[in-house]
């Protein structure tokens, strides 16, 4: 699922020039910043590596950025890979044996590591040892390699898919939450200075309100609104051009786009608001279940338009009101289903 409001990273996002390098530059996630600052200072004062850290939460909130910041703060090299990229034990062994003391190894989508790779990762995380089998059959032998003290940082949008043994080996688990409008305005104002964009306060407010609580989306929208302003002959990004551009991009006043409307209207039109199973929704919309669960549903739940119940997805009265559709009589009963099974 690719669209202007997708929180997934795009090759066109070009975040490097505006990506913060240190904790004091990072906007939002205040509790996480404060705790990380304490943990990093304590580790450095003891001349120890930082405990392995797990960032989880919706995409686009800064998990990769925070991992790079940690690397900068502790003075180690930053090595990055992803769960799907580590196909074999040999792939992991090659990465681990090239690490140096205090290096940060970042594994994105860590929930997608296969079981064989995970089992080799356990002693590497706990004892900083790599146990691998050399050879085959009767000639096979176990080789133990001592690894330097490194910090593994995992990132996932699907904490529930992470195995318990792997999750338990992270000493610092941290959940990243959606940003509020004020925090997103700070993100936009910082970026506008670095990108030399004349962004007014009202323009920043308009973009922030329609960015789904996600910095990555806010920055992407800022670039596109800048394009509309330039072609329209405007030297600054104000509320008027922001509203015009966002409407052209089909982003409504609360940050919903055509994909969100398709999702909500399918449940409203065909199931009177639900409940309906996620597989049914995915098949009807010709989307992958993962794409719906990671890209569309988190924000709809966050703003109170959708509920996940034991019997399926249910859209709320607020969703019907936003769609300007009459609320079916049974809707009140549907919401009681959620409460009874919670």
UniProtKB/Swiss-Prot annotation:
Principal place of residence: cytoplasm
Gene Ontology terms describing biological process? DNA recombination; DNA repair
For this UniProt entry, the molecular function terms from Gene Ontology, in alphabetical order, are: ATP binding; ATP hydrolysis activity; four-way junction DNA binding; four-way junction helicase activity
Q: Report the domain of life of the source organism.
A: Bacteria
Report the family membership. Answer: Belongs to the RuvB family.
Chain spans, region Small ATPAse domain (RuvB-S): 180-250
- Species of origin: Rickettsia conorii (strain ATCC VR-613 / Malish 7)
State the name under which the record lists this protein: Holliday junction branch migration complex subunit RuvB
């Amino acid at each position: 699922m690719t669209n202007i409001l997708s929180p997934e990273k795009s090759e066109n996002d070009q975040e490097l020039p505006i990506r913060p390098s240190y904790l004091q530059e990072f906007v939002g996630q205040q509790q996480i910043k404060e705790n990380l600052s304490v943990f990093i200072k304590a580790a450095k004062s003891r001349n120890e590596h930082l405990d392995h850290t797990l960032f989880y939460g919706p995409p686009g909130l800064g998990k990769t950025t925070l991992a790079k910041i940690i690397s900068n703060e502790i003075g180690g090299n930053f090595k990055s890979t992803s769960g799907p990229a580590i196909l074999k034990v040999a792939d992991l062994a090659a990465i681990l044996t090239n690490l140096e003391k205090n290096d940060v190894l970042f594994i994105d989508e860590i929930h997608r590591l296969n079981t064989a790779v995970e089992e080799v990762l356990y002693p590497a995380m706990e004892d900083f040892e790599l146990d691998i089998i050399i050879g085959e059959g009767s000639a096979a032998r176990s080789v133990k390699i001592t690894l330097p003290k490194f910090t593994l940082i995992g990132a996932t949008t699907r904490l529930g898919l992470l195995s318990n043994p792997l999750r338990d080996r992270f000493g610092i688990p941290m959940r990243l939450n959606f940003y509020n409008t004020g925090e997103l305005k700070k993100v936009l104002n910082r970026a506008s200075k670095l990108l030399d964009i004349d962004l007014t306060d009202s323009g920043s407010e308009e973009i922030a309100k329609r960015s789904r609580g996600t910095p990555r989306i806010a920055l992407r929208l800022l670039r596109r609104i800048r394009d509309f302003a330039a072609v329209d002959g405007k030297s600054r990004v104000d509320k008027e051009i922001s509203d015009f551009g966002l409407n052209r991009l089909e982003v409504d006043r609360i940050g919903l786009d055509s994909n969100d409307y398709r999702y909500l209207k399918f449940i409203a039109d065909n199931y009177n608001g639900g409940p309906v199973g996620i597989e049914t929704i995915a098949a009807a919309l010709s989307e992958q279940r993962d794409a719906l669960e990671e890209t569309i549903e988190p924000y709809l739940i966050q703003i109170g338009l959708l509920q996940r119940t034991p019997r399926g997805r249910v859209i709320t009265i607020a969703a019907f009101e936003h769609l300007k559709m009459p609320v079916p009589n049974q809707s009140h009963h549907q919401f009681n289903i959620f409460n009874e099974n919670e």
